[in-house]
């Protein structure tokens, strides 16, 4: 059983985690025509904006209510109203996603009531724009909680409720024996709730696989449509591409919901409660066994076998496992990231024969931590990782871990958010057959490149010992 060690320091050394509002903003950016709005000071928004721009290398439409000292003391309802109306007038977004910060959450204002009053007072002016509130205080949780809360807020406040009529046994039997191509298209819709740790490339690959089974994936949020680096024909003041508001409204028409990552359990449960759509939680899509189970799930939903292309990708992964497993046996790995991504990579490396000697994460609220294949998990920062990673063969974390890697003399595999000292990080594959294959090659190459070649003297000594034996 893994031992979870809570942080006992009074200060954070080289922070590991990003805040809840940032996670919520990333989720809102996966909706077409959206603008995330930080309800807080300009500094909070500027810091998050810098991280997003450096990671994605794109313009990010992140806005703020610009709370000052007076508004912080007397209340920020006027600032919130002014910001919403200004955004509607200047950008006409389809969605304004409000992310609260610690500055306003500490005052304990009733934001839901304030937004309801704004919507009622300015109903005509705000027509055609959804205003969604996600409570995301900086002092609680981390990036993955913010992402999940934003997705749950969109489902709660946008998705249409649906009272499902009980289906007869005869109707159920007909659905099972009818070919998917003969069933109504709306019955082939599958809602997919990806976790924050899936990259743009991961979501594109995920969509291709689901479509390969004749299903229609509705991905919420879909950052592969908005943060994939495409250049629009004209300047866009909002998120360009992503999930449409109409698709979020019609999530209740899906035959199944697939949530990826433990932190997406609550949004999936909420969707099931509101619409009756049953959900399946997939804790990881990395590794041969996990992907096999996912492919079997898609085959069960669609009633069709896996396409030949998927079998070929699986065969490529098997070959990569044969080629790469020699480089991982007995290797010591140190990982620091959010809980679900920690589980994803820890199980990936231990499946290759490596050992997790140091596991550091941002928050102890997730149940997935108890399943991490390590002796202990430290809730802490990159300073804790540096203290615990002595003797490791590979350090696995985001770009802020590069200084620790240099001081320890350990190679660094960059994952998560932010990655600002490498290009194309958003297109990196980490899931399904091809993503697992690419991770094996990348990690093995990093380990190989940092293993010194034996000198001539060492080779001669080995030959002498062999001949003497």
Swiss-Prot record:
Pathway: Cofactor biosynthesis; Fe-Mo cofactor biosynthesis. GO terms for biological process: nitrogen fixation; protein-containing complex assembly. The keyword Repressor does not apply. Gene3D superfamilies: 6.10.250.1090, Nitrogenase molybdenum iron protein domain. The keyword GTP-binding does not apply. [7Fe-Mo-9S-C-homocitryl] cluster binds at residue 44. GO terms for molecular function: metal ion binding; nitrogenase activity. InterPro entries: ChlB/BchB/BchZ, Nase/OxRdtase_comp1, Nase_comp1_CS, Nase_Mo-Fe_CF. Keywords: Metal-binding, Nitrogen fixation, Plasmid. This protein may play a role in the biosynthesis of the prosthetic group of nitrogenase (FeMo cofactor). Belongs to the NifD/NifK/NifE/NifN family. This is Nitrogenase iron-molybdenum cofactor biosynthesis protein NifN.
């Amino acid at each position: 059983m893994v031992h979870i060690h809570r942080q006992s320091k009074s200060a954070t050394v080289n922070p590991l985690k990003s805040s809840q509002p940032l996670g919520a903003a990333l989720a809102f950016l996966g909706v077409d025509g959206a603008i995330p709005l930080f309800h807080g000071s300009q500094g909070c928004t500027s810091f998050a904006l810098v991280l997003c721009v450096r990671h994605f290398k794109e313009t990010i439409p992140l806005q703020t209510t610009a709370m000052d000292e007076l508004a912080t003391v007397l209340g920020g309802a006027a600032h919130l109203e002014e910001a919403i109306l200004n955004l509607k007038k200047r950008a006409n977004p389809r969605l304004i996603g409000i992310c609260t910060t610690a500055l306003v959450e500490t005052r304990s204002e009733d934001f839901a009531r304030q937004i309801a009053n704004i919507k009622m007072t300015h109903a005509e002016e705000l027509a055609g724009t959804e205003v969604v509130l996600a409570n995301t205080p900086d002092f609680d949780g981390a990036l993955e909680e913010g992402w999940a809360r934003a997705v749950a807020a969109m489902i709660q406040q946008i998705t249409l409720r649906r009272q499902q009529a009980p289906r007869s046994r005869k109707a159920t039997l007909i659905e099972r024996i009818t070919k998917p191509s003969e069933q109504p298209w709306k019955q082939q819709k599958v809602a997919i709730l990806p976790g924050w740790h899936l990259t743009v490339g991961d979501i594109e690959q995920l969509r291709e696989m689901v479509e390969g089974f004749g299903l229609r994936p509705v991905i919420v949020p879909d950052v592969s449509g908005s943060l994939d680096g495409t250049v629009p024909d004209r300047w866009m003041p909002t998120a360009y591409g992503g999930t449409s508001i109409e698709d979020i409204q019609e999530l209740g028409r899906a035959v199944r919901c697939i949530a990826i990552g433990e932190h997406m359990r609550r949004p999936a449960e909420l969707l099931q409660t509101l619409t009756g759509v049953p959900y399946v939680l997939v804790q990881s899509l990395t590794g041969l066994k996990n992907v096999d189970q996912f492919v079997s799930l898609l085959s069960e939903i669609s009633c069709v076998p896996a396409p030949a292309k998927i079998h070929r990708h699986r065969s490529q992964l098997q070959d990569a496992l044969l080629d790469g497993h020699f480089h991982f046996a007995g290797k010591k790995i140190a990982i620091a990231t959010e809980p679900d991504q920690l589980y994803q990579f820890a199980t990936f490396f231990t499946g290759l024969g490596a050992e997790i000697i140091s596991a550091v994460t941002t928050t102890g609220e997730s149940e997935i931590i108890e399943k991490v294949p390590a002796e202990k998990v430290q809730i802490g920062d990159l300073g804790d990782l540096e203290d615990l990673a002595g003797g490791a063969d590979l350090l696995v974390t985001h770009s802020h871990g590069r200084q620790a890697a240099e001081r320890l003399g350990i190679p660094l595999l960059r994952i998560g958010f932010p990655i600002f000292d490498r290009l194309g990080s958003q297109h990196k594959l980490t899931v399904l057959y091809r993503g697992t294959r690419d991770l094996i090659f990348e990690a093995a190459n990093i380990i190989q490149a940092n293993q010194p070649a034996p000198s001539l003297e060492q080779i001669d000594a080995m030959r002498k010992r062999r001949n003497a034996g």
